[in-house]
Amino acid sequence: MVVHALVREDGTVEGGELYEVAGLLGMTDQQVRLCVKRLVTEGRFTVAGRGRRAVLRLTGAAGPAGAAGPGLPLVPEVEFVRHAYRQDGGLEPWDGVWHAFAFAVPESARAARDALRDTLTALGAAPVQGGLYVTPNAIGPYVRARAAELGLPESLSCLSTRDLAVGGTTDPRALAARLWPLPEIAARYEALHALASREAGAAEGPVAGLARAVALAAAFSAAMVPDPLLPPELLPQPWAGATARAAAAAAWDRLAGAAPADGPRLFRLYGEALA
C-alpha cells in the first residue's frame, strides 16, 4: 500500500522517497525491497535502477493514473464516502424502509453465488439467515446490476418493508445492534479519530507529512470500507464514525495544504472523495 500511495500523477514513485516514508511508518529496507519485488513480479510496476535511486513506474495492469487500481484499498468509493458525510450532516435521513434480498443458487454456480453474497456484504447488507440479507440503505440497483453480471437475475428476489422482525426483535435500533457488529465498527473509527487528531510536530518536513498522509489514508480505508453506513437513526449517539470522519477531513485539509504541488496522486484522490 505504501508504494501505491506514493504514486505521482505521472505514474512514478521515487525510490528515495519510498524508503524514507516507509521507514517512518516502521518498515525496514528489506521489507520495502520485498514489497517492490512482489509488485514488479505481479506486473503492477516496472523499476529502473536499484535501491534508493530506483524509479518505479505504474503499469497498465495497476490501472490508470487517476484511479486507485486493482488490489489497492486506498480510497473507498467516492459516492459512498460522500453519502457518509451527508449522513453526518443530517442530509440523508432514513425513511424507515428496510430492503431485503434473497437468493437461491445451486452448488453448480457456487462461484457466482459467493460473488453475489460478497457484493451484498460489501454494500453493507447483513445476513439474516441462509440466502437472506437486509439493509436500511436503498442498494437495490447495485445488487440487481451485479446479479445480472453474474447471470443470476432470475435467482434474486428483492423486497422492501417497514415491518421487519428478526427473532422477535422489531425495534430498528435493536435490529441494527443485533445484525451489525457496531462495537467493532466503532473501534475502527476510534483508531482513525486518534490518528487524525494528532498534531504535527513543529519541525515536521515534507517526508514526515507524506508518512502521516499514508497512515491517515490507511486508517480511513480500514474504517470506511467495512462500514455498512447505517443511518444515524439506527446508531448510538454520538456515533464514533461521524466524529472520526470530521477529524479525518480536518486532518486531510492540513496535510493537503502542506503537500508539494507535484506530490502523490493520493492527495487528489482523497480530495475528490472528501469534496
Regions found by a protein language model. Give the residues of each.
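Mid-protein regulatory/catalytic core that forms ligand/cofactor-binding pockets
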Residues: V105-E199
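Short acidic, hydrophobic short linear motifs in intrinsically disordered regions
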Residues: T12-A22
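C-terminal regulatory/effector modules of DNA-binding transcriptional regulators
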Residues: T170-A275
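Positively charged, polyanion-binding regions of nucleic-acid-associated proteins
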Residues: M1-E9
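Short, hydrophobic-biased segments on the C-terminal half of alpha helices
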Residues: R33-K37, R117
